[in-house]
Swiss-Prot record:
Organism: Bradyrhizobium elkanii
This protein's name: Nodulation protein K
Keyword entries, A-Z: Nodulation
C-alpha cells in the first residue's frame, strides 16, 4: 500500500509522520474544513513525498511533484493512484497548524471509520503519532 510522509512545522521543530495513502485523502480533505473555515481555504499541511513498494517488492519508490493544494490532490483520485506522485504545501500567508490538532483530527476521523483499512491502527497523543500497518 502506498504511504505518504507528512511534515508539519511546529513552533520549535518539524514534526513528521507517515500515513497510508487512502485514509490520508480523507484526513486532508477533513482538515481543510476544520474550525469553520471557508471550504476554499486549505490548512497548512506539507506532504514531502510519497513512497510505495514496487511491483516486484525489490525496493521502495519515492517521488515528488509540483505543489498542489489539498482539494486538487483529492480531486486527482488519491484513492485510485497506483504510483504516488504528489506534494502539498500551504500558502505562506496561513497560520501554522499545530501538530496536536492534526493528531486529534486524525483520531476523530479514524474513529468514524473513514476508509481506514482494518489492519491499520492509529497511535496518537505525541509528536510521534503515526498510522501503522
Amino acid at each position: 500500500m502506498a504511504r505518504l510522509s507528512i511534515a508539519i512545522q511546529g513552533e520549535s521543530k518539524m514534526h513528521k509522520t507517515e500515513v497510508d495513502l487512502v485514509p490520508a485523502a480523507c484526513v486532508l480533505d477533513e482538515l481543510s474544513h476544520t474550525d469553520g473555515q471557508p471550504s476554499e481555504r486549505v490548512m497548512p499541511i506539507a506532504i514531502l513525498g510519497a513512497t510505495e513498494l514496487s511491483q516486484d517488492a525489490d525496493g521502495v519508490c519515492t517521488t515528488r511533484s509540483p505543489h498542489w493544494d489539498v482539494r486538487a490532490y483529492v480531486d486527482h483520485g488519491i484513492a485510485g493512484t497506483t504510483r504516488a506522485s504528489c506534494a502539498i504545501v500551504s500558502p505562506p500567508t496561513m497560520a501554522p497548524l499545530r501538530f496536536s490538532q492534526l493528531s486529534g483530527d486524525l483520531a476523530r476521523i479514524v474513529e468514524r471509520g473513514c476508509r481506514m483499512p482494518t489492519h491499520s491502527r492509529l497511535i496518537s497523543g505525541s509528536a510521534n503519532s503515526e498510522c501503522l500497518t
